[in-house]
Amino acid sequence: MAKKGTRVVVTLECTEARTSTDPKRSNGVSRYTTEKNRRNTTERLELKKFNPHLNRMTIHKEIK
């Protein structure tokens, strides 16, 4: 049988969606799923992704 891989599926969530108070934008949480290599990247991921609720690029952090 094959060994278990070091890749794990992680969820990225927008950090600015909850702090936004713009009434023109709908409330919602932007989440993305991706994979990361646990051996090479031990710390939490932090990427800039598009948030469709805020209609701009925002920082998305890895959640547990």
Swiss-Prot record:
Region (Disordered): 19-40
MF terms (GO), sorted A to Z: structural constituent of ribosome
Keyword vocabulary terms for this entry: Ribonucleoprotein, Ribosomal protein
Gene3D superfamilies hit by this protein: Ribosomal protein L33
Domain of life: Bacteria
Keyword hit for Ribosomal protein: yes
Family of the protein in this entry: Belongs to the bacterial ribosomal protein bL33 family.
Protein's recorded name: Large ribosomal subunit protein bL33
Organism whose genome encodes this protein: Prochlorococcus marinus (strain AS9601)
Gene encoding the protein: rpmG
